[in-house]
Every structure is written in structure tokens, then in C-alpha cells.
Design a protein with these regions (language model features):
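Catalytic cores of DNA base-excision repair glycosylases
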Residues: 17, 23-24, 28-240, 244-245, ...
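Short, amphipathic alpha-helical interaction segments positioned at domain boundaries
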Residues: 303-304
Length: 304
């Protein structure tokens, strides 16, 4: 690929180049894939659960907790019918708990429709399911050809496209789909998982290990230097002072309290009573808690 072609997102990549990259990446993945337990299950429901979990949680933690979650809610129907409180208890350790609510809503919608759909377009219509998750489920569970693109896969695609200028999300997806178009049926899911492994181990944002990369003979960006993102000059706020810490603390208290609920009043760590009250009220509005009257709250339950 010539230097002049860099950044020209409208011009398709060479098909033979794409085929060589695909063969090299899939061969590397077949030999070195991370031994993740979640990859042992490729049924649509398990893939949906693991992909929603992995949106904002490290894959090592997802791998530890997904098995337990799936044992507690082994089917789409069991998750849809569960008490939301039980789902939130099982979600402990994954963070960003609104994802658990969205996952349960998606399960309920899918059950009402007769099961998880197989197309990207239909999956996106489910509550809380965005383009990446829809493409990941379609590719991994149903053999779809569209490559799911997150920030890690976007980085690899941009480097393979030899783009000096940042590509827009649409341009990255179009480039990724060029690779998907040259894959055999059912290979797009493996390609995406391979790219995730490559991004984690080799094709890193600021310090890629090009000499260890299985694509080094084909990648036009091999050996280039990539600058680190500038750090903010402001000191980082200690986690115990953040709203996330307070939400986690209150949610854990409600998890421990069970159906009877817990008294939520007073200070928590470095957060005053007003901050605690504002946070629990927001959690109620988001569906993460429900009021029992006064200062008593619990996780959401359907009855009583």
C-alpha cells in the first residue's frame, strides 16, 4: 500500500492483502488463543451475557464471574423471569450495574419475541444493545459476517489501513467489514476474538510490540511510533471520594440486606448525608433500588 493511500477511507483495501491478513490472524489465534472459559460457550444467550459484561469490565474478571452468573441464570427465560434484586446480587464485582438491568430487559424482550434474533439490525432493537454488542453476538453466535468494532479493534483496523488521520466510527466499520467480506462463513467471530487478543498482547495503543506481531509482514504500520495520549494535569480524585465509590457502597449494603432492606441515612466515608440521599434517590430513579418508606431501601422486587 502506498503512502498516498493513507487515510483514503473511500478507496477499498487490496483484497489479496486482506486475505493474507485474515489467514495470518486466524492461524495465530488458533495456536495462541487465550484460554477463556467464556469462549467455551458459543450459544447466543451465553455470548450475549459475556459481551454485555465485557463492555466496561476487564475480560479476566468477566471470565471469573460469567460462569457463576450463567449457572444462576442458565437460560434467556430464567434471566427474564428473575427478580431484579437477584440479578443485581449476581452482578456483584462487575461494576456499572445498570448493564445488569439492561441485560434483563433485553432478555425479557427477546423472550417475548420468541428468542434472540440473529441479525445485527434486530439485535440492536433490543433494550440496551448497541452496535458493537449486536455485531459481536451476530458474528460469534450466529456466524454473521460483520466485524464488531470497539476501541481495540478500531486501533488494529486503522493501522492495517495505514491511516495517518483518525478514522471516523463509520469509516472504521467499513474497513472492518472489508476484512469480514473475505472471511468464510462463521469466521468473523473468531476474527474479532483474535483481534481482541492481539490488541491486548501485541498491538497496544502507545507501545505496540511489532516484532512479536503475527501481522508484521503485512501491516503497513509495523515499526511506526505512536504517541501516548496526554495526561490531564489535574490530580486524580481518590476513588473513595467519587460518586462511583458511594454508589458501589450503597448497592453492596442493599445486596447484603436482602428483601427486608436497609436503613440508608447518614454519612458514608467522605460523603455527607446530602450526597448519600441524592445518590440513593438517583439509584431509585434508575431502577437500582426501591424505597420502603422513610430512609429504608432495598433492591427491586416484583411483589410485596
Amino acid at each position: 500500500m502506498t503512502k498516498a493511500a493513507r487515510g483514503a477511507a473511500a478507496q477499498p483495501l487490496d483484497r489479496e492483502f486482506i486475505r493474507k491478513v485474515n489467514r495470518a490472524l486466524l492461524a495465530w489465534y488458533a495456536a495462541t488463543a487465550r484460554p477463556l472459559k467464556i469462549r467455551e460457550r458459543s450459544d447466543p444467550y451465553s455470548v450475549l451475557v459475556s459481551e454485555v459484561m465485557a463492555q466496561q469490565t476487564q475480560i479476566s474478571r468477566v471470565d471469573q464471574l460469567a460462569t457463576t452468573f450463567l449457572a444462576r441464570f442458565p437460560t434467556l427465560e430464567s434471566l427474564a423471569a428473575a427478580e431484579t434484586a437477584d440479578v443485581l446480587v449476581a452482578w456483584k464485582g462487575l461494576g456499572y450495574n445498570r448493564r445488569a438491568l439492561a441485560l434483563q430487559r433485553a432478555a425479557a424482550a427477546a423472550v417475548a419475541a420468541g428468542g434472540l434474533p440473529s441479525s445485527v439490525e434486530a439485535l440492536i432493537e433490543l433494550p440496551g444493545i448497541g452496535p458493537y454488542t449486536a455485531r459481536a453476538v451476530a458474528a460469534i453466535a450466529f456466524g454473521g459476517r460483520e466485524i464488531p468494532v470497539d476501541v481495540n479493534i478500531a486501533r488494529i483496523v486503522a493501522r492495517l489501513a495505514d491511516s495517518d488521520a483518525p478514522l471516523s466510527p463509520r469509516e472504521v466499520q467499513l474497513r472492518a467489514n472489508e476484512f469480514g467480506a473475505e472471511l468464510a462463513d462463521g469466521e468473523a467471530g473468531a476474527w474479532a476474538q483474535a483481534a481482541m487478543d492481539l490488541a491486548s498482547s501485541t498491538c497496544r495503543a502507545a507501545a505496540p510490540k511489532c516484532d512479536e506481531c503475527p501481522l508484521r509482514e503485512h501491516c503497513p504500520s509495523a515499526g511506526r511510533t505512536f504517541a501516548k495520549a496526554p495526561r490531564s494535569g489535574e490530580p486524580r480524585t481518590p476513588f473513595t471520594k467519587t460518586a462511583r465509590w458511594l454508589r458501589r457502597r450503597l448497592l453492596d449494603e442493599l445486596r447484603e440486606a436482602g428483601r427486608a432492606g436497609a436503613q440508608v441515612a447518614g454519612e458514608r466515608g467522605e460523603h455527607n448525608e446530602a450526597a448519600v440521599a441524592a445518590t440513593i434517590n438517583k439509584m431509585v430513579s434508575e431502577g437500582l433500588a426501591e424505597s420502603l418508606g422513610g430512609d429504608r431501601y432495598r433492591l427491586p422486587h416484583r411483589g410485596d
